[in-house]
Amino acid sequence: MDKKAARIRRATRARRKLQELGATRLVVHRTPRHIYAQVIAPNGSETLVAASTTEKAINEQLKYTGNKEAAAAVGKAIAERALEKGIKDVSFDRSGFQYHGRVQALADAAREAGLQF
């Protein structure tokens, strides 16, 4: 099993458990150059809020989009947008990525901005 297949297996297992709970999910995806975050409805078929480093408003504030500072900016933006829509409690879905570095920076920034998970 290669590295990507192992990550996808971990992500699938976690998502199955979150779906059983019926929780609103904060989903994170990262690439070497960008980081993406979405808040997905409990039924899994609707994206309620999204933010990423590819957005012009976030991208203009950053020198580089593939670091912890960029992840923190996305975390703050996703939390602010979720709170505007009345979403306070979410379950953190790290998509099989290690809770370390950019994923952790995004989560910490979202918590500081008011999301609870």
UniProtKB/Swiss-Prot annotation:
Lipid metabolism found in the keyword field: no
GO BP terms: translation
One Pfam family matching this protein: Ribosomal_L18p
Membrane-spanning residues: none
Gene Ontology molecular function: 5S rRNA binding; structural constituent of ribosome
InterPro entries: Ribosomal_uL18_bac-type, Ribosomal_uL18_bac/euk
Keywords: Ribonucleoprotein, Ribosomal protein, RNA-binding, rRNA-binding
Any Gene Ontology CC annotation: cytosolic large ribosomal subunit
Function: This is one of the proteins that bind and probably mediate the attachment of the 5S RNA into the large ribosomal subunit, where it forms part of the central protuberance.
Family assignment from sequence similarity: Belongs to the universal ribosomal protein uL18 family.
HAMAP family for this protein: Ribosomal_uL18_B
Subunit structure: Part of the 50S ribosomal subunit; part of the 5S rRNA/L5/L18/L25 subcomplex. Contacts the 5S and 23S rRNAs.
UniProt-recorded name of the protein: Large ribosomal subunit protein uL18
Species in which this protein is naturally found: Photorhabdus laumondii subsp. laumondii (strain DSM 15139 / CIP 105565 / TT01) (Photorhabdus luminescens subsp. laumondii)
